């Protein structure tokens, strides 16, 4: 990922939450093995009584009103996303966590560009499940809260934390739907969230563990276990050379770790000759910046510079699990960007697969170099759509932060499909410009056909997209710059601090809707 020189599903663990706890503590610790998360809505009017969800009402009736009675004396009404824990109310559930869902009527917010009700459910359920885990209970049953898919996503995303390499593990918590509600929607939510968690795990794993070869092997294992309608090709350096991918090879040559070109196929369409959608993901498994080396502070985060490859591959694995009736191909050029005597030097000129020459004025703008060859190769499949994802520019983080993925596309149809999918998932996208204004800044090049950085410091995300456009002739292409959404501090309440796996769920939703539209 090129950073502008500006003036900086596994086991689970949670932090202690500031919650109120009420009820009898007479049950022994040995009895406390299962928890329950129930939702309650905010008051619509000042004089209203906060309303339980349907599951909450039924549970309160089972207790002859004791849940409501205990809630009324426990403090002020619960705000959205807040939790309150009660003990000893029911023998099957020694701990019951009430979670605030906000207003029941919450729907699509046209300013926020998401479904507020679904986001409230995800955040509330995540907080409730973390509280159950914090109590060291091994299982939790979850109120569907009116949307079982959103509830499942909140539970599975909220409970995930990467601790694979720690000796001391926190207790894993299994979550399931409370009652006999919409199991199909719940399982769909589990699938969507598990797809994102796969991307999170790939992105979080240290670079000495997550090499290009290891990444490819993990995706191969996951894809083959997801469906029999799949093919995986782990292409070695010799194949990359045969394909004349000189731009990709120029980045890889600085590292002793061999490059891999991962090519995955999901053949879900009943028509084997149906043109596929092609997803392309940047797969830099560690980005030091090369000779244009990065500052050491936070360089460790560049283990996730393969986030584009992680998200597109995880989305395809999820599509295979959903058995979608479409054909999809995933392409991921995988390598490290390291400094050495063999590495690219500023001012070098390399040749891409389509014959265009590239002046490499900044070796830290390497993602676009490997994507250039992959995008050229993507055209050989006669695709319906080409979509690439990449943690491409620090400028994208400056522009949008973690609020949304930046989308550059030559197709309003494709933009609308991605935008609609993002409203559903809450993992938002925002359209960015592909003006000729930016193209001129990369094709005005002294030594080659195109420069890998723009003439000016401004609009770095836009000039990076303009560079990629030089290797695209397809009329339905989108470039997703995910640099700003790569990590989470506390912005997304149902994701812990760390790598996010965004926007995997939006890509899955896009594929699902595309398959339905083309049925």
UniProtKB/Swiss-Prot annotation:
Gene3D superfamilies linked: Leucine Aminopeptidase, subunit E, domain 1 (3.40.220.10), Zn peptidases (3.40.630.10)
Lineage: Eukaryota, Metazoa, Chordata, Craniata, Vertebrata
Binding residue positions for Zn(2+) 3: 202-203, 205, 303
Binding site for Mg(2+): 287, 364, 366
GO biological process terms on file: proteolysis
Keyword Nuclease (UniProt): no
Protein known as: Cytosol aminopeptidase
PROSITE patterns: CYTOSOL_AP
Sites of N6-succinyllysine modification: 45, 61, 103, 221, 455, 476, 489
Pfam families: Peptidase_M17, Peptidase_M17_N
Co-factor(s): Zn(2+); Mn(2+)
Membership in a protein family: Belongs to the peptidase M17 family.
CDD domains: Peptidase_M17
Cofactor binding, per record: Binds two metal ions per subunit. Two metal binding sites with different affinities are located in the enzyme active site and can be occupied in vitro by different metals: site 1 is occupied by Zn(2+), Mn(2+), Mg(2+) or Co(2+), while the tight binding site 2 can be occupied by only Zn(2+) or Co(2+). One Zn(2+) ion is tightly bound to site 2 and essential for enzyme activity in vivo, while site 1 can be occupied by different metals to give different enzymatic activities. Mn(2+) is required for Cys-Gly hydrolysis activity.
Post-translational modification N6-acetyllysine, affected residues: 221, 455, 489
Main localization (coarse): cytoplasm
Subunit structure comment from the entry: Homohexamer.
Secretion signal, residue range per the UniProt entry: none
Database matches in HAMAP family: Cytosol_peptidase_M17
Organism: Homo sapiens
Localisation: Cytoplasm
A single Gene Ontology CC term: cytoplasm
Single Gene Ontology MF annotation: carboxypeptidase activity
Binding site for substrate: 282, 287, 292, 294, 305, 364
Catalytic residues in the record: 294, 368
Residue positions where Phosphoserine is found in the record: 42, 54, 180, 194, 238
Keywords: Acetylation, Aminopeptidase, Cytoplasm, Hydrolase, Magnesium, Manganese, Metal-binding, Phosphoprotein, Protease, Zinc
